[in-house]
């Protein structure tokens, strides 16, 4: 079933179009239940080989392809050698595109981790004041770090006992209370897509040929994500006789994805991390990924066990895929009353 997706038809051949692993957007019990968009048949198409795209809706779509086309049809016609000049021709193209996060939510960096009720008790250093303490303070002040809420003290450079990346616990000395305003943005990078394509065409009075090969390399805006795709295509047409013409097209695509980030509301989702990342957390503190002495066993989650370490998600909880696909079609046109 296609769900609510349109049916994709390439040179008359319907392609499978549902997402590979729809999973659960909310309430997933573990990483395996999260949604992962590995793409569909349309993502296997090489844009360099597309001649035209036509969209069919309603009765015209279902009349041709039945119930599968209830959500419409995207009809793709690939290139051939029909429009080429006589003789042989070779063309080469290359292009690169860059990607960045276009817009960010207006995150608040005025207050840090904690709750409004965290007021220092009489006899402590923070008596009657909002305070922060990563773990119990040296004077017995209770910990305020066991929450993902950011209703704690205002950032005014106060001296609090905070997390120390050196000992992966409470620092031995108080440090200034400051916000790290790029502690989400710095997880992302500039992505790019590089494409190189070569095509060979040939045409005579009785037929035409087009063959192409394209390599695409993508590095996405999150580290350790992206894909490589190699596409090859051959299109040929030959006038066998005055009455008979044969057309043949075949395409092969190899697509390898090194990591597709999971989607949804779960601790193994980058989106989940972005929601609950606190403004007083330096992103660099999470880069070691593992607790010292427990490498590859226990991930470093200094602020909450409910929030996955983003670097573990990206480098260890990978969702790779490798796919080979082929679409071929052959047709013959016979003129009955040919003279």
Residue ranges and their predicted role:
Residues 1-2, 15-17, 59-64, 81-84, ...:
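Short beta-strands and strand-coil junctions in structured, solvent-facing domains, enriched
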Residues 13-57:
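Short acidic/polar hinge/loop motifs at secondary-structure boundaries
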Residues 21, 83-179, 190, 220-225, ...:
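Surface-exposed loop/interface segments of Gram-negative outer-membrane beta-barrel transport/assembly proteins
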Residues 189-205, 214-216, 310-339:
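Outer-membrane beta-barrel transmembrane strands
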